[in-house]
């Protein structure tokens, strides 16, 4: 038996993000579905006052986890142009696609051909025209530079060492002046022997050395262990 929705309201801080309240008192994040009737990863579809929303699962999306853990700055609006490194099968990019809308663009880079095909099937083939898929290696931005114009935000979520360096290298190519970067630090992908907090500091220092002002850092427990989200600007 489904639980009835009693309210959908805009998030008090974040554009394009909504809070759904159910009759049992629980609340969930959601975004307004850009492609009504279609799911991306099995998420619940919620209809309220003639509008369809997609539940945003923080255990499947590190951006949702960061928002629930108190992230104050999400530099994504309607019309934002973004480079997303490590698009995987498209869970978080799909919600960003909802937020940026038809005037926005998400250049989505994924390295694995198998995962890239899944991304295509779940997002591009389902009518998300604001998503530009790129099969490529985020370590080598020159390989896909001819596909991308300047972007407002560079977002990275890759299981590689030197995550901050990869982000900064891409920002040098594509980030507009005054633009933002969003770094998901996966500590265990960088150094399994070091405490996660030390790895976070190391990656943040790399951003600072590359000329970024670090604005906010949020740890992602309990949704993801040894992960953090960093927002910075150049």
UniProtKB/Swiss-Prot annotation:
It comes from the Archaea. InterPro entries: Fibrillarin, Fibrillarin_CS, SAM-dependent_MTases_sf. It is an enzyme of class 2 (transferase). Keywords: Methyltransferase, RNA-binding, rRNA processing, Transferase, tRNA processing. S-adenosyl-L-methionine binds at residues 91-92, 110-111, 137-138, 157-160. One of its GO terms (biological process) is tRNA processing. Belongs to the methyltransferase superfamily. Fibrillarin family. This is Fibrillarin-like rRNA/tRNA 2'-O-methyltransferase. It comes from Pyrobaculum calidifontis (strain DSM 21063 / JCM 11548 / VA1). The lineage of its organism: Archaea, Thermoproteota, Thermoprotei, Thermoproteales, Thermoproteaceae.
